[in-house]
Design a protein with these regions (language model features):
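Function-critical hydrophobic alpha-helical transmembrane segments in multi-pass membrane proteins
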Residues: 144-155, 164-165
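Short aromatic-rich membrane-water interface segments that cap or initiate transmembrane helices
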Residues: 42-45, 131-141, 247-254
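Juxtamembrane helix-capping/reentrant segments at transmembrane boundaries
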Residues: 33-47
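Membrane interface segments of multi-pass transport proteins and intramembrane proteases
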Residues: 95, 100, 126-135, 296
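Long, low-complexity, intrinsically disordered cytosolic termini of multi-pass membrane proteins
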Residues: 352-439
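Alpha-helical transmembrane segments
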Residues: 1-29, 53-89, 165-294, 298-373, ...
Length: 439
């Protein structure tokens, strides 16, 4: 009941707050401008994370008081609230005026240090994974900081298409929340389900056609932080002898729950390293960008990646009785293989082309954007963005008549050049005739 009420209150509050944010952002013209890497073509309100955060915090504090949390849990609640406030304002500033990477890193470091040193929330053991057991205190603190910052930024990186960050956030938080519910950890139940309620309300607008809103860094960094916090609490509660429900493969299950953002981050970092670029350079090599290039819409890509995430969690849970290192090997082998098959399946590519053609027929603006509607009325096109040579982006046209488009466009250019030359020549002749008559 507590989980349901906390989630419901956060949902209702966020549903009330977000329309006010949309109105304010439009009036103040604080819109997200489409750029080379953008998967959207129109100005869109951002700062959706502010509405989610406000609803989450109010729900968390209110039910924390109602439940009557003990002093240690109240300290955890207040430290968690303080650290997320820092991240939210950091995200707002980055949404409005882009922050330098070092300033964002410093803010993330401070937020992480608050919960580690005030509440001693840290990873204390690998539970035998890779032959590592209990960690020394300093190693434990440093590794926990690394995990927090990794998950925050990994989650920030997947916030590239409509619904994706929110959907993965709900799946991950629900996975942790069910574990906390079985163990009657009421503070963490509130954290998990209040976050689910706030994200669910945001998705109503993020997936809307007329009242669209982006969460921005103010949302993605806070969600990533809260998921990292839940993940570490999950590991520590699973290790404690007082747990009512335990899982003997905690670290592997945690990796599976966060597999999509972590795998996507690792993938783009490897690609950038191969191209001798900074791992923090922005590009369009993310998994969700690849699905858009295949022809899937934002919603279709989000649904596909969400299904894969659920399958990864289910796989890790089913393998729980195996030796932990064998589990790790199996999970790290099968999950990337699923994504590889997703990109290279001929059937998926064919279906993507069909879906792309149907959608392009319904949306004639794609043809207008590329400037071929007047000259190539039968052409079915859709504009997406892809990185070329790791540095520049170009519009990629998917459709049945690519050659026809290229030939006709070249022909049209030549015709225009010829007509322009004829016009210049005729003007010169007329000018010459006039001058001869005057003489």
């Amino acid at each position: 009941m507590l989980a349901f009420l906390g989630s419901l209150l956060a949902f209702v509050l966020a549903s009330r707050i977000i329309p006010v944010i949309i109105y304010t952002v439009r009036v103040k013209n604080l819109m997200d401008e489409p750029g080379d890497r953008s998967a959207h073509s129109d100005k869109t309100p951002t700062l959706g994370g502010v509405g989610m955060f406000a609803a989450f915090v109010v729900s968390l504090i209110l039910f924390g008081i109602v439940v009557g949390l003990e002093r240690p849990d109240l300290v955890k609640l207040l430290s968690l609230t303080l650290s997320t406030i820092i991240l939210m304002f950091l995200g707002i500033k980055d949404d409005l005026i882009a922050l330098a990477a070092r300033k964002k890193f410093l803010g993330q470091l401070i937020s992480t240090a608050i919960v580690i040193f005030l509440t001693d929330v840290r990873i204390t053991s690998f539970e035998g994974l890779l032959g590592v057991g209990e960690l020394p205190y300093l190693v434990s603190v440093l590794f926990t900081i690394f995990v927090f910052i990794l998950v925050i930024n990994a989650f920030n990186l997947i916030d590239g298409i409509d619904g994706l960050a929110g959907a993965i956030g709900i799946i991950s938080s629900l996975s942790f929340g069910l574990f906390f519910l079985l163990n009657k950890d009421y503070l963490m139940v509130l954290v998990s389900f209040s976050l689910i309620g706030a994200i669910s309300a945001f998705l109503r607008y993020n997936l809307s056609g007329t009242r669209k809103l982006f969460m921005g860094d103010s949302g993605s960094m806070v969600i990533g932080y809260l998921l990292a916090y839940q993940g570490i609490r999950f590991l520590e509660l699973n290790l404690s002898g007082s747990s009512l429900f335990t899982i003997n493969n905690g670290p592997v299950l945690l990796l599976a729950i966060l597999s999509f953002p972590l795998l996507d981050t690792l993938r783009v970092f490897i690609i950038r390293a191969k191209e001798r670029r900074s791992p923090f350079d922005a590009d369009c090599n993310h998994i969700h960008h690849r699905l858009l290039i295949l022809g899937f819409s934002h919603k279709q890509a989000t649904i596909m990646l969400s299904i894969v995430s659920v399958l990864a969690i289910e796989l890790a849970y089913l393998l729980k009785d195996l030796e932990i290192n064998l589990q790790l090997f199996t999970v790290t082998l099968i999950i990337p293989l699923i994504y590889y098959l997703l990109f290279n399946s001929t059937r998926i590519r064919e279906n993507a082309i069909k879906l792309n053609e149907v959608r392009a027929v319904k949306d004639k603006r794609s043809a207008v954007d590329l400037g071929f509607k007047k000259y190539v009325p039968s052409l079915i096109v859709r504009k997406t963005f892809v990185e070329e040579s790791g540095h520049s982006q170009k519009a990629v046209v998917n459709g049945a008549n690519r050659r026809e488009k290229a030939e006709l466009s070249e022909k049209r250019i030549k015709e225009l050049e010829k007509s322009k030359m004829h016009l210049v020549v005729s003007k010169k002749i007329k000018k010459k005739n006039k001058s001869s008559k005057l003489k």
